[in-house]
Amino acid sequence: MQRREFLRLLALAAAAGASLRPGASEAEAAEELYELPAFGNVSLLHITDTHAQLLPVYFREPDVNIGIAAAAGQPPHLVGEALLKHFGIAPGGTQAHAFTFLDFEAAARRYGKVGGFAHLASLVKRVRASRPHALLLDGGDSWQGSATSLWTQGADMIGAQKLLGVEVMTAHWEFTYGAQRVQQAVGKELAPIEFIAQNVKTVDFEDPVFKPYTLKNVNGVPLAIIGQAFPYTPIAHPRYMMSEWSFGIQDKHLQQLVDEVRAKGAKLVVLLSHNGMDVDLKLATRVRGIDVILGGHTHDGVPAPTVVGNAGGQTLVANAGSNGKFLGVLDLEVKTGGVAGYRYRLLPVFANLLPADPEMARYIDGVRAPHRAKLEEKLAVTEGLLYRRGNFNGTFDQLILDALMTVKGAEIAFSPGFRWGTSLLPGDAVTRDHLMDQTAITYPYTTLNEFTGEQIKAILEDVCDNLFNPDPYLQQGGDMVRVGGMTYACDPRQKIGARISDMRLGGKPVAANRTYKVAGWAPVAEGASGEPIWSIVETYLRAHRTLAPRRLDLPRVIGMQGNPGLA
């Protein structure tokens, strides 16, 4: 779609009442979305979880993001109409499309793709024009998620971050390139970007591996930015990749650092976090003296921060989505006594609304040029919508499950509940580029094992507890393992061991003592091997060429009627 046609459709949408924001007049169209008057004396720009998406993409937000216990009905566990109502967003317009799955296919065709570093660069420059001292912070998961990032070990994204003007970052998936590669990148390639993580220490003497924080002065305001890497990296990923490092939330150490930077004169303390939003919300109640948490990991695009009270006052907790789809803009008025006021906008990056920054576009073209033929090779065409996000399954994950069962001859298949991965509309070609968007990891091996029904239930219970444990500190983010070929029931309200029931294969109960052939991928054990997942799926795609709409293997969810995290 050409930009002129997009603007025409946008104007028509506004005329029909689908305003860019509540109360917008009919005459306002494209420019209104990014009108952002400056406020205060400190501005923070925030991106997170871009997952190496250099080009604009389609990305469908989840229709299932269940919150339980205290998180039920609270951000970020709101989807669809419940999210719109909570944040006062008018249905049917650009904001509704950006933040929800509602009418996704039609809205995606109307408004076009989102993100892309060339378009993001234009938006960053536009916002910085009225905020010349704004700091751009990257919450991590930037070096992983695409073919070129995997093939260059993140070097393509380091170049893009530097060109974008990122000043500070923390990390998660970056560590899956291995400790040696991360140290090489931080020590030799990343400058002038500062890499900070207070919760990564050596296993032997608990020495800090990276700088825990950085001190800045913006418009005469001394401030500190503390880094919080993903606390469960060695659990969620192969331990051998960072065997000499320990992680964890380490909120007591964090409190010591907050006190330390306050003693050094910081009037504003920011935590650049990759905890996940639920963990950040709990942490904000336990650690005093943090003014702002700019969070990531769980990919929650939340239109407004949550204000959390604690012994030291209040903490703003914000989360800025994923895949380069959003730019968070936080303007603060900081006085001698602390934060006196703030304004926050989570700006969707619509590629049709923002011109591509020429310098960034040239850089991206240079990154892709050596691989272009391989990346753009068409493997199949999809007749249905392909997407990943959702607590239990997505159609692209179903495609991966179907491929695993077919190619490896399995009765049941498991696929990790990753939250990264882009979307494709009906009629789109599935290229190798798109396939790698779903599978580009450093431990892509596929497996075929024999598990008993008892073992299968234990696996599902373990992952389900990670997702639905009522204590956020015992959640690791991500979604439920995707299950192909087998149905089951899930009651998120129960404790571990009692959430999974009624497992069936071909309509018959799964027997606890019988063995079943189970295919999977992404094993975390050292020494694992097997054909990479992208080869398995490519074999399946080439055999089919035209992909019928996927029928999702979904559990029967118990006890969640009326939960606003379930559409």
Q: Which residues are covered by each model-predicted region?
A:
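Acidic, metal/ion-coordinating pockets
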Residues: 3-11, 17-352, 359, 391-403, ...
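Feature captures C-terminal
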Residues: 30-43, 47-69, 192-198, 211-213, ...
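Short, functionally important structural connectors and interaction interfaces within domains
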Residues: 46, 285, 319, 367, ...
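A short C-terminal boundary segment appended to hydrolase-like catalytic domains
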Residues: 81-82, 95-99, 333-430, 439, ...
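Charged/polar, solvent-exposed surface patches and flexible loops
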Residues: 122, 126-129, 184, 256, ...
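Short, solvent-exposed loop/turn motifs
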Residues: 222, 385-386, 487, 509
